[in-house]
């Protein structure tokens, strides 16, 4: 299924039904009087967060949603039928904006959450309502009230426990494919991942969490460069970030600074968001070169970076357990592996990871 995280749709609620002009006609009743019923109320337009959806792709094929008009009033004081509602079903995590793309209408963060987008129009009055002491036989009724119409924007922000961030070609998709059962596109060129991906990490017992692969960010992402705003929006809901840095590039410290600057420029709250930093692709360098890259990274990152390889699996489990601990899982029943020591003189890059 293709991933779509933004869509513009047109909505219109149903207009109210017209009131009826009718008079009572019955044998031996010469002056029956008015008995026209009111029109029915038009249908509303709702939006609802449902389970089982993780993309807005359905709105690529249907952009117009219209509720039904209310039924017209009838004689014998019969009110018209109410118009059927229109319900837009979206994934959890969808935000609704006005057409200006700045004014937020609602943020759907829970399954079953519903928001009224456009109420239906009221039904018109039948002539019975216009009867008075000076007008016993009114021939007047009201048309139904027109429904509301508007354009809105839908934006999906994935709800994941942890997010993978980094520059393009940092190995995020490879890590996701090794850590979960997800099958993202993997290739040896930048911007392979064009849409966010999700996978479920299962560490045994009840330790499970959702991991999101965020497409590569570039300098200026906070200002919208390279679809930066759309990608950063998915990071916004993650409780912890795993920052992958390609150790084969010339400046790992610069790569770290670039991503951190863009995150904090987009939202100051990212400064306090838990972060795990890992040097990836250590299988591509000798232990001596890995040590040198680690030294460069520590000039800007004061913590202890992990050493991992998505290809061989080295250090992957360490990173996953570090994420689980930040998420507050109880790991008492899980045999934790010995953490990788980034301060060792000769980091071991030759031992492949095994899930056993």
Curated annotation (Swiss-Prot):
PANTHER family: DEVELOPMENTALLY REGULATED GTP-BINDING PROTEIN-RELATED, MITOCHONDRIAL RIBOSOME-ASSOCIATED GTPASE 2. The keyword Amino-acid biosynthesis does not apply. Residues 1-159 form the Obg domain. The lineage of its organism: Bacteria, Pseudomonadati, Pseudomonadota, Alphaproteobacteria, Hyphomonadales. The keyword Zinc-finger does not apply. Belongs to the TRAFAC class OBG-HflX-like GTPase superfamily. OBG GTPase family. Its cofactor is Mg(2+). Gene3D superfamilies: GTP1/OBG domain, P-loop containing nucleotide triphosphate hydrolases. It comes from Hyphomonas neptunium (strain ATCC 15444). GO terms for cellular component: cytoplasm. Its EC number is 3.6.5.-. Mg(2+) binds at residues 173, 193. One of its GO terms (molecular function) is GTP binding. An essential GTPase which binds GTP, GDP and possibly (p)ppGpp with moderate affinity, with high nucleotide exchange rates and a fairly low GTP hydrolysis rate. Plays a role in control of the cell cycle, stress response, ribosome biogenesis and in those bacteria that undergo differentiation, in morphogenesis control. It is found in: Cytoplasm. Residues 333-356 are annotated as: Disordered. InterPro entries: G_OBG, GTP-bd, GTP-bd_Obg/CgtA, GTP1-OBG_CS, GTP1_OBG_dom, GTP1_OBG_dom_sf, OBG_GTPase, P-loop_NTPase. This is GTPase Obg.
């Amino acid at each position: 299924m293709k991933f779509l995280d933004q869509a513009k749709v047109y909505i219109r609620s149903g207009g109210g039904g017209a009131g009826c002009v009718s008079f009572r006609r019955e044998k031996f009743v010469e002056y029956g009087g008015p008995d026209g019923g009111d029109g029915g109320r038009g249908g509303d337009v709702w939006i609802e967060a449902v389970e089982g959806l993780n993309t807005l792709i359905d709105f690529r094929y249907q952009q117009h949603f219209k509720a039904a008009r209310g039924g017209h009033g009838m004689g014998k004081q019969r009110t018209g039928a109410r118009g059927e509602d229109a319900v837009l079903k979206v994934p959890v995590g969808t935000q609704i904006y006005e057409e200006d793309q700045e004014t937020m209408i609602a943020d759907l963060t829970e399954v079953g959450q519903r928001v009224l987008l456009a109420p239906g129009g009221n039904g018109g009055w039948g002539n019975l309502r216009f009867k008075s002491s000076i007008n016993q036989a009114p021939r007047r009724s009201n048309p139904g009230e027109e429904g509301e119409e508007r354009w809105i924007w839908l934006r999906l922000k994935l709800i994941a426990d942890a997010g993978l961030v980094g520059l393009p070609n940092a190995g995020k998709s490879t890590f996701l494919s090794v850590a979960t059962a997800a099958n993202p596109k993997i290739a040896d060129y930048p911007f392979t991942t064009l849409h966010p991906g999700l996978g479920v990490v299962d560490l045994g017992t009840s330790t499970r969490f959702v991991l999101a692969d965020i497409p590569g960010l570039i300098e200026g992402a906070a200002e919208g460069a390279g679809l930066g705003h759309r990608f950063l929006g998915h990071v916004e809901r993650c409780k912890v970030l795993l920052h992958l840095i390609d150790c084969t590039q010339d400046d790992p410290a610069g790569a770290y600074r670039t991503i951190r600057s863009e995150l904090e420029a987009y939202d100051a709250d990212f400064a306090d968001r838990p972060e795990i930093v890992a040097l990836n692709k250590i299988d591509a360098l000798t232990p001596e070169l890995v040590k040198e890259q680690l030294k460069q990274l520590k000039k800007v990152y004061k913590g202890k970076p992990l050493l991992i390889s998505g290809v061989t699996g080295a250090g992957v489990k360490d990173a996953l357990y570090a994420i689980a601990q930040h998420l507050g899982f109880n790991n008492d029943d899980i045999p934790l592996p010995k953490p990788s020591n980034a301060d060792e003189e000769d980091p071991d890059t030759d031992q492949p990871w095994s899930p056993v």
